[in-house]
Each structure stands twice: as structure tokens, then as C-alpha cells.
């Protein structure tokens, strides 16, 4: 008997199953950090005429403790952002629920060996992890107190493997972010509206320049050499062991010019 009430939904973790509810709700844990963060609706639902909802995604695939290292916490946050973005971008998806809000107790055969599942964007005591800022930053601010600005890196080199910095992202609902080193202005960054997170209301912002014009100001380098050197340093900050062919060519060019 069909009642005049809100649509019903269940939860399932396999494709093309029998639909007994009004909405096909699917636990989509397909994402492994590359490619699309959710499966195509047409490949999952058994009835494309009915509504479709991603009932779970995210945290279960990358358990993250609040005391995990900076890189691990950032990966979790970016995975949540990818899930949110791709569910918004895909036509016909009513919405998505990240699994889950907070870490929780579990039995000894599950979780991380301590009877705790670290799937949440908050810990068990509701203290936010970095990934909580992904959700908080999607609110459009109506007053200064509504501004969210969470930087993924603590900039503590001694806490990073080999003392090598990695990617730095800002989760914010501000229109732009300005970076200073002391009183020296470095650069202003805005969301990439055509990038990986373009479907989000407020995409996270990658900070990819930590040098700006400081080499010209303090080292007396000419603009061309300063620009090339800054590009190399910024790339080394992200991955010092795997420089691109372009950066290697820049290093060679700088060596030749300095030897002249």
C-alpha cells in the first residue's frame, strides 16, 4: 500500500539489486584516490526511473586517526572533497552521505585493533579532524563569523618525513586567501573553478607558491632567474624526489647562465 509520505530508501553495497523502496540508496566505496570518486548512476541502479542516493562514501576506505601524520589527514580530507564534488557533478544523484560524522566504538574484529573505527570527520569526542573543514567550508558566509579557514599544514618540517614539505591546501569559504611570510606578501590564491573540485560551492584552494618575489627582493636575482628558481623550489616542496622534466631543464638553464 503506497502512503502519502516522504520517499523511502534503504542501503545496499551491491549494484543492480532489487529495489523495494522509492529511492535506490547505494553505499559507494569505489574510490581509491584516483579517477571518479563515485560510480556512474546508470551502472548501479536497477531502476533508472527512480531516485538515486549515495548513502555512504569515504571514511571507511581510509581510516584516519586525529593523531595521524599531516599527509594522512590531508588525504582523508581531499577524498571527502572528491566524493562531495563528484556526487554534485553527476546528474541524477540526489545527494551523498560521507561515512561518517564521528569515530565510533566497534568490536575487536573490526576497526584499528583498539575497538575503534576511525572513519569520521570528527573523533569520538566530536573534536573535528581536518576533513570536518571540508563540510564546514561549504556554508556560504553571511557575516565575518561564518568564515571558515583551515590550513592543512602546520608548516612544521620536523614532523614530516625527511623534513620535506608536501602539498598544502586551504579549506575555506572565503573568496580568496593571501599568503604572507612575516610582513612580506607572497601571493593571493583563489578557488580553481575548472579544477578537480569545480562542482563544490567553495572548492578547497591549493597553496602552490611559497616564494613569490622574495628572491628578487632579498637575493638580488634578476626576474627571469628568480621566476625559474621559484618554480623549482615550489615543485621541490611538493615532491623533492621526483622533479618534472621542465624543472630539470630549468636547473640546467640556471647552471649555464650562472657559469657564464
Q: Where in the sequence are the language-model features?
A:
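Carbohydrate-binding surfaces of carbohydrate-active enzymes
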Residues: 86-260
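Substrate-binding/catalytic cleft of secreted carbohydrate-active enzymes
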Residues: 1-131, 144-159, 183
Amino acid at each position: 500500500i503506497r502512503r502519502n509520505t516522504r520517499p523511502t530508501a534503504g542501503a545496499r553495497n551491491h549494484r543492480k539489486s532489487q529495489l523495494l523502496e522509492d529511492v535506490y540508496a547505494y553505499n559507494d566505496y569505489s574510490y581509491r584516490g584516483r579517477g571518479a570518486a563515485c560510480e556512474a548512476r546508470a551502472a548501479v541502479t536497477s531502476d533508472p526511473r527512480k531516485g538515486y542516493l549515495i548513502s555512504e562514501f569515504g571514511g571507511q576506505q581510509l581510516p584516519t586517526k586525529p593523531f595521524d601524520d599531516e599527509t594522512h589527514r590531508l588525504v582523508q580530507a581531499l577524498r571527502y572533497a572528491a566524493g562531495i564534488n563528484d556526487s554534485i557533478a553527476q546528474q541524477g544523484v540526489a545527494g551523498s552521505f560521507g561515512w561518517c560524522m564521528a569515530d565510533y566504538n566497534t568490536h575487536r574484529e573490526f576497526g584499528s585493533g583498539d575497538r575503534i573505527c576511525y572513519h569520521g570527520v570528527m573523533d569520538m569526542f566530536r573534536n573535528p579532524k581536518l576533513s570536518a573543514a571540508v563540510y564546514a567550508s561549504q556554508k556560504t558566509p553571511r557575516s565575518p563569523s561564518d568564515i571558515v579557514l583551515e590550513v592543512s599544514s602546520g608548516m612544521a618540517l620536523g614532523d614530516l618525513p625527511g623534513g620535506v614539505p608536501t602539498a598544502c591546501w586551504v579549506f575555506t569559504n572565503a573568496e580568496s586567501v593571501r599568503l604572507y611570510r612575516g610582513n612580506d606578501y607572497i601571493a593571493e590564491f583563489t578557488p580553481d573553478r575548472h579544477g578537480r573540485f569545480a562542482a563544490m560551492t567553495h572548492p578547497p584552494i591549493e597553496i602552490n607558491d611559497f616564494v613569490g618575489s622574495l628572491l628578487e627582493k632579498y637575493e638580488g636575482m634578476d626576474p627571469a632567474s628568480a621566476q625559474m628558481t621559484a618554480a623549482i623550489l615550489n615543485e621541490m616542496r611538493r615532491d623533492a624526489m621526483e622533479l618534472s622534466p621542465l624543472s630539470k631543464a630549468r636547473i640546467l638553464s640556471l647552471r649555464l647562465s650562472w657559469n657564464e
